Amino acid sequence: MIQKNAILDVADNSGARKVLCIGFLGGKKRALVGDVIVVSARVVAPRGKVNKGRVYKAVVVRTKGPIRRLDGSTIRFSSNAVVLVNDQGDPLGTRVFGPVRKLPVGEFTKVMSLAVEVL
């Protein structure tokens, strides 16, 4: 579960390393895996596509909080991570690092296809 002012890792090669959650789309108070959030780039790599302080949209792909599956099992990750996306939902980077939780059907298929492992 992601709340406002949370510092998140970036799981793609867009150039951002850490981002700050500054808002949610859809009038929500918190975000889970698959939700789109508004972030501000805080730590960026030199010569990346992302500029420090700029505002971007991102989709949550990993959370530290446990996620309950339909079969009763739970899954949790070691970090909260996002992938930066544009207005159409396509990722800004060309690679996605680490495992990605299965995202809602029909949404962010490009992000899931770039992921190394989909859980």
UniProtKB/Swiss-Prot annotation:
BP terms from Gene Ontology: translation
One Pfam family cited in the UniProt record for this chain: Ribosomal_L14
Entry's Gene Ontology cellular component terms: cytosolic large ribosomal subunit
SUPFAM superfamilies assigned: Ribosomal protein L14 (SSF50193)
PROSITE patterns xrefs: RIBOSOMAL_L14
Single annotated GO MF: structural constituent of ribosome
Keyword flag Ribonucleoprotein: yes
UniProt keywords, alphabetically: Ribonucleoprotein, Ribosomal protein, RNA-binding, rRNA-binding
InterPro entries (UniProt xref): Ribosomal_uL14 (IPR000218), Ribosomal_uL14_bac-type (IPR005745), Ribosomal_uL14_CS (IPR019972), Ribosomal_uL14_sf (IPR036853)
Keyword RNA-binding appears in the UniProt entry: yes
Stated role: Binds to 23S rRNA. Forms part of two intersubunit bridges in the 70S ribosome.
Record's subunit section: Part of the 50S ribosomal subunit. Forms a cluster with proteins L3 and L19. In the 70S ribosome, L14 and L19 interact and together make contacts with the 16S rRNA in bridges B5 and B8.
Family the UniProt entry places it in: Belongs to the universal ribosomal protein uL14 family.
UniProt protein name: Large ribosomal subunit protein uL14
Organism, as annotated: Anaplasma marginale (strain Florida)
